[in-house]
A protein has these predicted regions:
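A structural signal for beta-strand and strand-to-loop patches characteristic of beta-rich domains
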Residues: 1-306
């Protein structure tokens, strides 16, 4: 609790000092949420409550970088740069946008025993501008390498700007830097992998990667996914199951560290199917169990009241 007060009357004002949590580094550009709650009791003894949240930070501007998780070298990576107030209102800003190739570790680091999932996944939820602790198993912590692209940017009244950058297969980090109206630096970052789906070799030194352009497909199309390992050699066991029946089961190819998994989707597969991946290396099991949605888009329910 930051402050509290009592009042009498039909209007009131609350003033408090929005002090930061000093255990959170200012370098991470944190945003703090302060919630004001009021309990009002009328003359009959009935109490009503309401609350309002206020956001405060070291800067008056927030910036983000967005891009789809699935990227291939066949087409440019499309980035969306956004600058907003801490309350999410669009704000115009200008600055620089750069893309760096990352310095990969000399060898693949196996996953920690405490983790129950592959040690790196897109959209892990880490704050975009947070600098994680050095960890060769976590690409978000890898050091920056050579600059691949650098350019100025300017968001307009909408607070957004779209850019496209052609990139070869590999792993990169996009970095944005701008300033708020008080001249304080605001940053954002996004780690991105670009894949070459025609290659037999997975180019990033992580133990296990499983990705797909879409996890919802329609009958008449083909589901596509990619499995890869950064080890010099490695094979995974792949199973595709539908309604407790195995559609296909196979080992990824010998002599390759990247495999494209494809499955033709039929009408009979509506409701979805499951892709299971089993890969074991250096006493670590990397297991995937992903449901691919095949929606009942051919069925429509209409409800009417008369």
């Amino acid at each position: 609790e930051v402050a509290s007060t009592r009042f009498t009357g039909d209007t009131f004002a609350i003033t408090f000092t929005a002090l930061p949590d000093l255990s959170v580094s200012e370098k991470t550009e944190p945003t703090f949420t302060f919630t004001v709650t009021a309990d009002v009791t009328d003359t009959t003894g009935e109490t009503r409550s309401d609350s309002q949240s206020v956001l405060a930070g070291y800067t008056a501007l927030a910036a983000t970088i967005r891009a789809d998780a699935w990227q291939t070298q066949d087409k440019p990576v499309e980035w969306t740069l956004a600058t907003t107030s801490l309350d999410g209102e669009p704000q115009a800003a200008e600055g620089t946008f750069a893309i760096y190739a990352l310095k990969q570790p000399e060898r693949v680091e196996r996953a920690a025993l405490s983790e129950n999932r592959p040690y790196w996944a897109y959209g892990s939820g880490r704050a975009a501008n947070t600098e994680p602790q050095a960890d060769p198993a976590n690409p978000d912590s890898w050091e920056l390498g050579d600059v691949v692209s650098e350019q100025p940017f300017k968001t307009g009244a909408t607070g957004e700007l779209k850019l496209a950058t052609p990139l070869k297969a590999g792993i990169y980090r996009a970095m944005l830097e701008t300033k708020d109206r008080f001249g304080k630096t605001v940053t954002a970052r996004q780690t991105m992998q670009v894949m070459d789906v025609k290659s037999a070799t997975y180019p990033v030194r992580v133990a296990h990667q499983f990705a797909a352009p879409a996890w919802s497909v329609e009958p008449g199309t083909t589901f596509t996914a990619l499995w890869g390992t950064g080890y010099p050699t490695g094979r995974a066991y792949v199973e595709l199951r539908h309604r407790n029946q195995t559609l296909r089961a196979f080992w990824t190819g010998a002599g390759r560290t990247q495999e494209i998994i494809e499955q033709a989707v039929t009408e009979a597969m509506r409701g979805g199917f499951t892709v299971l991946i089993t890969y074991v290396r250096e006493n670590r099991a990397y297991l995937e169990n992903r449901v691919v949605d095949v929606p009942w888009s051919n069925k429509k329910l209409t409800v009417k009241w008369e």
